[in-house]
Amino acid sequence: MAAEDVVATGADPSDLESGGLLHEIFTSPLNLLLLGLCIFLLYKIVRGDQPAASGDSDDDEPPPLPRLKRRDFTPAELRRFDGVQDPRILMAINGKVFDVTKGRKFYGPEGPYGVFAGRDASRGLATFCLDKEALKDEYDDLSDLTAAQQETLSDWESQFTFKYHHVGKLLKEGEEPTVYSDEEEPKDESARKND
């Protein structure tokens, strides 16, 4: 009966016997694409579970730094934490100082927002300006920002409060630093740990 089907369809019996299926797979571009995709996915499934050998990647992150104790900073003290002089990266936003070290790719020396590292980034974030000249070296009271810029700054502050460790506040000239106890942790951070 199989021979009758071959004769009825007009196919050459030698084509079916000599790898007709393989011939069809390798002559159709769509089938080749699907075969390549299957091989790639199989490779990723099998190879993806194996950890990369140490030293293979240039993107190796340095080991995480210990959590910084809460303290307050003057603008001059903050400048040291730019990722170059000190491996830790701190930024001030709206008077609050955040440890953004885990965001080194963004805020580190080579990152797109590296200009803000070790500085009060409030004015730059509020005005969407990445120029170093827009940032002040002394305490910036931000009194000249518009209502829209203040709202933008508040949004940035909320994002940083949610994502990064709040380590203290930025001190005005002549302002005394707050003395924090070792057990003290802000309410927003303890709530974040419960998530």
Curated annotation (Swiss-Prot):
Binding, heme: Y113
Pfam families membership: Cyt-b5
Recorded coiled-coil stretches: none
Transmembrane segments: 25-43
Region annotation Disordered: where it falls in the sequence: 51-71, 173-195
Major subcellular location class: membrane
Written domain comment of the UniProt record: The cytochrome b5 heme-binding domain lacks the conserved iron-binding His residues at positions 107 and 131.
UniProt xrefs under PANTHER family: MEMBRANE-ASSOCIATED PROGESTERONE RECEPTOR COMPONENT 1, MEMBRANE-ASSOCIATED PROGESTERONE RECEPTOR COMPONENT-RELATED
Name used for this protein in its record: Membrane-associated progesterone receptor component 1
Annotated organism of origin: Homo sapiens (Human)
UniProt lineage: Eukaryota, Metazoa, Chordata, Craniata, Vertebrata
Recorded name of the encoding gene: PGRMC1
